[in-house]
Amino acid sequence: ASGDLLDTIYLNQRRQSWYEEYLIKLGDPEPLPFVGSAQGLDATTAATLITEALDYQVTNRTKLRPISKVRSHLMTKFEELGGLVIFNSMVGNNTKRMLDLEEFRGFTLQSPIAPLIFINANDTVNGQIFSFLHECAHVWHGGNSGVSAGGDPLDNRDTQIERWCDQVAAEVAVPTTDLRDNFNPH
């Protein structure tokens, strides 16, 4: 892993720790019910849980134009659930240290009270949305924190879980039933 990726992870671990300490000072925080709630579920069922939690049903999406509103909507809904979301294209605010999209697209830092999703904003908006949905799948699955897509997986990449997260993200983005109902080959 590059120094830029490691520094980005460390910075966000500090942010997450600060937020966890803040929540503890406010009172005894309850574990967020969605964290780990999809473990053992098939991708379609998990996608339904995420879609409902993020209020991202197909019927609601027509209001979300242009595409940047989709990203904003998903981020806001995840934060309303109690999670943290960071979209950034550089290490901290250092414009001389741009993040390499080929190295990673996003990562999740798991926490029962403050899960954090980081998305590499050097990707297209559509790519960022898919990466966000993929990282949401990690949060709903629970388990270890980790880096998604790119080169060195920091020795924490389970390809079966990564495939499952991709399937969940794809199902949230384009539900199979909606695709079947609206696809007309003639």
Where are these regions (language model features)?
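Short juxta-domain linker segments that transition from a proline/glycine-rich
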Residues: A1-H186
